[in-house]
Amino acid sequence: MGDYPALPVQLDSDRVIPFYSYLAKEFVFADHHFGSGSNSTPGHMLAIGGQMPTLKNPPFIGPHPVWDLPSIFTTADAGHVSWAAFPDQGGYPTKLYTSLTTTPGSANVFPPKDFIPMAKAGTLPEICYVWSPSGYDEHPPHVSDPTYITKGHDLVWERVQAVIDGGGWADTTFILTWDDWGGYADSVPTPVIETVPDALHPDGWVAIGGTRIPLIMFGGQVMQHIDSEWHSHASIPKTIMDLLGLPPMGVPRVDTAPTMAHHVDASLKRAAPPVPGSTIRQPTPPTPRPTPVAPAPWAGPLGQSLPPLVTRDGSVVPAPTDGLVRPKPPKPPVIR
């Protein structure tokens, strides 16, 4: 974390990530979605249960903390809705939740290799959270590898096709996003919703608001739309809850989050995307070119301190203050 200037970089999306580019143009692209102001683990946990007990990454190997927090999975259990989680090879990030590492919840946690066979067989439950395994998560490698984005992009494509092959396209709503921004400063400031003080920011830096993160929503019943509303990863479980009629989670950040459920229309029968490996013909640009729509102001309170966490067992988990502050920006990447 730190205060860095934005780095002007352009990416040829149609060439490098053609499947993502196609989905963003054909379905719902959220251009004002955001995560946390920190890194991977807070982002994942915000998307699972709307809370962040830490602002840094716990050890990926060896002993690690476990928290007894509500999540979309405990909420699904309360609503008698089936679910499954497919974390990476090491069980990250579901291994950070008590309810997902103990019975009965652990029985619904599968290794990444199981997703495609289950999808093709049509045996997936109603809710699935699916993470990319290590090596396919689109994180820049320590050693140069020009294929690192392609590998992750193509795995997502294959997984979507597996759902299609299993007959699930017509009634499946996909939400594709990333744990964090993964880059440098964003050129568009997000709302200052919740803050945490540190050595560089005695009045607080933006913990919720963070940086914008791409989010694409697609499926057989998902409309074509640019969603310019401000919403965070907490809107992911909120949207699932609204689509499936689940009870409140009991986490205010989730229960009051903006929903994206209105992008789903049961009367729609959208065509499935091209099959993996095919040459994608991108949609024809609209004429006239749409005018960008500014988002409405954030409807909730602003400038609030990050609150203590809601737990399942009634224990007290204070708001995290363990973020690592870096006064100097990292070395910019070499642009080729």
Regions from the PLM with identified roles:
Residues 1-336:
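N-terminal pro-sequences and low-complexity stem/linker regions of secreted or lumenal proteins
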